[in-house]
Amino acid sequence: MTETNFTIRPLAEGDLAEWLRLRLLLWDESTEDDHMAEMVDIIENSDAQFVAVADLGDGRLAGFLEASIRSHVEDCDTENVGYLEGWFVEESYRQLGMGGSLVNFAEDWARQKGCTEMASDAEVDNVVSQQAHSRLGYSETSRLVHLKKELV
């Protein structure tokens, strides 16, 4: 396997098309318009939201991470908790330390914002994500099943 050089850095204006491409790979149930609306919201509310990217140096991004500051997070002890909203590395670039580097970068951002805790979530059946979190020092705090009922 050849060595892959990458740089972890904050999102830049020139990254929007690549960020959208990666978001569509991670959250493929959302439309491009939905993604664009969310991206605008993140950019316009950059005090409490943050995007880091894994830059391959040739105009391509291999991964990204979106983080935020949440005023309350289940099972956390403090207010204003850093939160990993979503992170993704393209399959061909996994197992190279890119995901961990993205998370470390986001944790540094949260510390700079005054946070003393970082939290995240993973789908109950997404064992790969749960294992990735665990390798980075995150521990499971609880499991939750969402329920709904139509009121007619």
Please tell me what each predicted stretch does.
Residues 103, 110-122:
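Conserved GNAT acetyl-CoA-binding A-motif
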Residues 89, 95-108, 131, 135:
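Conserved acetyl-CoA-binding loop-helix of GNAT-fold acetyltransferases
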Residues 71-84, 94, 141-142:
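A conserved beta-turn-beta hairpin within the catalytic core of GNAT-like acetyltransferases
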Residues 53, 60-69, 83, 88:
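Conserved beta-strand in the GNAT
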Residues 20-34:
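Helix-loop element at the rim of GNAT/NAT acetyltransferase active sites that forms part
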Residues 7-19:
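A short beta-loop-alpha structural element at the N-terminal edge
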Residues 30-52, 56:
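Active-site rim helix/loop that mediates acceptor-substrate recognition in acyltransferases
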Residues 100, 112, 124-142:
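Conserved active-site alpha-helix within GNAT-family acetyltransferase domains
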